[in-house]
Amino acid sequence: ISGSTTNNNTTNNNNCNNMNKNSFNTDNSTHNTININNYGYENKDYITKDYLVKLLKEPFQAIPKLIEYTHFNKEHPENQNIKLPNKKQPYVKILKGDKWVYMDRKSTILDLIDEKHCELNDIPLLKHVEDNFSDNLQDRFERFNDRYLNDEKDFTNQLYKETELVMI
């Protein structure tokens, strides 16, 4: 709490008016310190099996959505460790060794897509898909994996573009 006193003296036709004004200001600021994790060391505790299963029901959107949920989630700013500083430049910035470093945009995004594909193909998760998804959902997931693993150019380009849009 800080206080201040102001004395104003005004003379008007030999009349003296004294005014005392007291005001008190209270600073109720909250300072939050957020420690951002290095790229590759994200907190994934909040990414539940149920959330991943939900993503797998729409596998063709799963990777960009998982990237957004991991790296651009407002509720988890500690994972906001990759930036696209200028959409016209071929670089991204990642937090590495507690410093922001420039990396090649295309290779970094493709690595990120690969990482999320691996997360979605975790053995226990695949077992859940096999045991609980309808044949139609299983087929859709298998088509997604086949296209990804066969490195189909159109499919890979679409994933890249959707991931880039998440970053903008």
Q: Language-model features: where?
A:
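Extended amphipathic coiled-coil helices
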Residues: S2-I168
